[in-house]
């Protein structure tokens, strides 16, 4: 994996896309299906040729790139996005320090990869299986991510599964961020450069 600004921007957009979709599902009970498929597929895509290969094409990360450019601001929605991103990255840091959990995560994802022989990627059963990986392996590492939204929407089991599967996708992208050399200082001092890179990518779509 190359450690370039481009690679970091792609990985961070992956986190942003998962978070933006969590917001959509938690609020409305549905979300951008193409972006959802990209984010879910990224969980299972563990041997990509390069960073963008995790997601497919740059256009498949449009929602995440848009969120990176204008979704992280001081509005209530932007503050929520920021909270989710910080929480996911903190959780991934704790997870990566636990070899037992990382090994278990790898095993469970391999099992999910085999299940795609029997289920469509976005089948309810498949989403439920991915949600259970998050619940069983990632969530116990703590701290728990508090998802806010419409109570009646979040009470529905299918939406809970989607949210957890998307949080797992966020963790996948946070792992990728670390693999391509992403550091906290890049978020504090280098975010403007990432925004500029994301704008270039969006402009050529």
UniProtKB/Swiss-Prot annotation:
The keyword Plastid does not apply. It is a peripheral membrane protein. Keywords: Cell inner membrane, Cell membrane, Cytoplasm, Membrane. Pfam families: DUF489. GO terms for cellular component: cytoplasm; plasma membrane. It is found in: Cytoplasm; Cell inner membrane. InterPro entries: HflD, HflD-like_sf. It comes from the Bacteria. The keyword Cytoplasm applies. HAMAP family: HflD_protein (MF_00695). Belongs to the HflD family. This is High frequency lysogenization protein HflD homolog. It comes from Vibrio campbellii (strain ATCC BAA-1116).
């Amino acid at each position: 994996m190359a450690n370039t600004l481009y690679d970091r921007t792609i990985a961070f957009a992956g986190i942003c896309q998962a978070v933006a979709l969590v917001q959509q599902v938690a609020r409305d009970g549905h979300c951008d299906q193409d972006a959802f498929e990209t984010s879910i597929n990224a969980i299972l895509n563990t041997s990509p040729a390069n960073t963008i290969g995790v997601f497919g094409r740059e256009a498949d990360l449009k929602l995440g790139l848009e969120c990176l450019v204008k979704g992280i601001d001081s509005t209530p929605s932007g503050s929520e996005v920021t909270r989710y991103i910080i929480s996911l990255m903190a959780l991934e840091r704790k997870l990566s320090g636990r070899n037992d959990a990382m090994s278990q995560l790898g095993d469970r994802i391999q099992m999910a990869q085999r299940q795609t022989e029997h289920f469509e990627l976005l089948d309810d059963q498949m989403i439920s299986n991915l949600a259970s990986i998050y619940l069983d392996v990632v969530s116990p590492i703590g701290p728990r991510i508090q998802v806010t939204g419409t109570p009646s929407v979040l009470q529905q089991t299918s939406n809970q599964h989607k949210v957890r599967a998307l949080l797992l996708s966020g963790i996948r992208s946070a792992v990728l961020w670390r693999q391509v050399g992403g550091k906290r200082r890049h978020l504090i001092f280098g975010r403007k450069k990432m925004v500029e890179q994301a704008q270039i990518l969006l402009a050529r779509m």
